[in-house]
């Protein structure tokens, strides 16, 4: 995708060397935005092959409200293993905040169910927001949320989503995040009777780890190929009833996968 290649170039050209929590070292800059028209194809990177199975199962795991890696491991997804404790627990991470946000009074709030109902009944609302940044529980999380807040917007029968991501690993994380939130937008559009609009990705700290620079430059040398298409295998009435088999990716022809070490 041209947007992603432009993003990589921006960080390489305008970023500065900066230390980080992991000790790896980064080239970092602050503030950026990409936009993807979901009617033009499913925004899954073509300059390297992505593992759609991991993207889809992680999103389904979030939507279940699950915070144990067992479900992911049972489905061949290992992307959270480094942060889990000996029992597979991660603390109150994304799934917990999305589905059972704990307020100061002890009440739990299912933000996803509330969001779906609000989109259906009050599509002009400017409060179609889900937050994973629960300040009172940050210290209990194995990893505080990087993609921490998203908002939906309904216009002319189309559903758009804007994500704010406080911390963005350009090489490993961002390609997954783009595809994940594009998929989330499409499935919410599906269950609310809307068409997909745009996915807008807004960033805080964007960084390329020092041990990913070679891989990023390799991607910049590769040509951008046509985007794949995503369709659903069946009509699904509830967002919580989706299964991996419901997602069909067509015409995905990426360049080969590029490996990169995860900084924990």
UniProtKB/Swiss-Prot annotation:
Keywords: Cytoplasm, Methyltransferase, Nucleotide biosynthesis, Transferase. Coiled coil: none annotated. Its main location: cytoplasm. Thermolabile. Inactive at 46 degrees Celsius. Catalyzes the reductive methylation of 2'-deoxyuridine-5'-monophosphate (dUMP) to 2'-deoxythymidine-5'-monophosphate (dTMP) while utilizing 5,10-methylenetetrahydrofolate (mTHF) as the methyl donor and reductant in the reaction, yielding dihydrofolate (DHF) as a by-product. This enzymatic reaction provides an intracellular de novo source of dTMP, an essential precursor for DNA biosynthesis. Homodimer. It is an enzyme of class 2 (transferase). (6R)-5,10-methylene-5,6,7,8-tetrahydrofolate binds at residues 51, 169, 263. GO terms for biological process: dTMP biosynthetic process; dTTP biosynthetic process; methylation. Belongs to the thymidylate synthase family. Bacterial-type ThyA subfamily. It comes from Bacillus subtilis (strain 168). GO terms for cellular component: cytosol. GO terms for molecular function: thymidylate synthase activity. Its EC number is 2.1.1.45. DUMP binds at residues 21, 126-127, 166-169, 177, 207-209. It catalyses: dUMP + (6R)-5,10-methylene-5,6,7,8-tetrahydrofolate = 7,8-dihydrofolate + dTMP. This is Thymidylate synthase 2. The lineage of its organism: Bacteria, Bacillati, Bacillota, Bacilli, Bacillales. InterPro entries: Thymidate_synth/dCMP_Mease (IPR045097), Thymidate_synth/dCMP_Mease_dom (IPR023451), Thymidate_synth/dCMP_Mease_sf (IPR036926), Thymidylate_synthase (IPR000398), Thymidylate_synthase_AS (IPR020940). The active site is at residue 146. NCBIfam families: PRK01827.1-3 (NF002497), PRK01827.1-5 (NF002499), thym_sym (TIGR03284).
